[in-house]
């Protein structure tokens, strides 16, 4: 379930090239989840790492996590 959620969220990521020729990526509805790296691949990898940490912290603190492609992670806490 977690892997599916991460993959679905990463499919929603948006990237752009900044004026300094670095890549910026973010995922809409995931406040604070963004990355800025020299290459697109590095930006994707960093964005996924940030997303993973954001999810873990959110679950631990009981925060609302957005539903992605019908997947809800907040149910994990309810089941535990």
Language-model segments: residues:
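Short, charged, surface-exposed hinge/linker loops at domain edges
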Residues: 1-12, 45-80
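Short aromatic-glycine-(Arg/Gly/Cys) micro-motifs in beta-strand/loop hairpins
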Residues: 12-30
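Short secondary-structure boundary micro-motifs
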Residues: 17-21, 41-42, 48
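A short, exposed loop/beta-hairpin motif centered on an aromatic-Gly-Thr core
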Residues: 31-42
């Amino acid at each position: 379930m977690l892997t599916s959620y991460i993959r679905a969220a990463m499919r929603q990521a948006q990237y752009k090239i900044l004026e300094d020729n670095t890549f910026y990526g973010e995922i809409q509805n995931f406040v604070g989840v963004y990355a800025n790296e020299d290459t697109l691949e590095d930006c994707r990898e960093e964005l996924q790492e940030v997303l993973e940490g954001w999810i873990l912290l959110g679950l631990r603190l009981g925060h609302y996590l957005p539903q992605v492609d019908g997947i809800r992670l907040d149910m994990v806490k309810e089941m535990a």
